[in-house]
């Protein structure tokens, strides 16, 4: 188990986060919620946790999967959300789930230093392919 309080030195951790914990109730609940929202048979390819700080310089990128899901664990400033292709910013509200085509160019919105140093954003990212 990773405590958000103790997790001070990492900005990304475990690309196999969910498979390592798939039998735990909280992970089953999250996986089932994603499956329900998508309403198709899906296969998890990768999962990890991001910790976003002011010194992070997130760049635009995409994934090679059918779907990318971002679950926001903690984010005091939701306006610093996920930036999608063409500079569309989707707010990152705590306990929210963003699902989009993994091939869409996207990035985490970088926070100003004055905010990010004391208010990290924690998110769980999951990549899926359709079965």
Predicted regions and their residues:
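Catalytic core of non-heme Fe(II) oxygenases with the double-stranded beta-helix
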Residues: 40-131
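Non-heme Fe(II)/2-oxoglutarate
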Residues: 1-41, 57
């Amino acid at each position: 188990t990773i405590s958000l309080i103790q997790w001070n030195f990492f900005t990304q951790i475990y690309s196999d986060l969910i498979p390592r914990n798939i039998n735990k109730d909280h992970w089953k609940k999250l996986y089932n919620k994603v499956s329900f929202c998508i309403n198709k048979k899906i296969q998890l390819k990768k999962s990890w946790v991001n910790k976003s700080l002011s010194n992070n310089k997130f760049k635009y990128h995409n994934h090679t999967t059918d779907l990318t899901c971002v679950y926001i664990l903690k984010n005091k400033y939701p306006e610093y959300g996920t930036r999608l292709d063409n500079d569309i910013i989707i707010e990152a509200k705590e306990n929210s789930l963003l699902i989009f085509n993994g091939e869409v160019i996207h990035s985490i919105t970088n926070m100003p230093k004055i905010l990010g140093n004391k208010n990290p954003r924690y998110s769980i990212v999951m990549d899926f392919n359709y079965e």
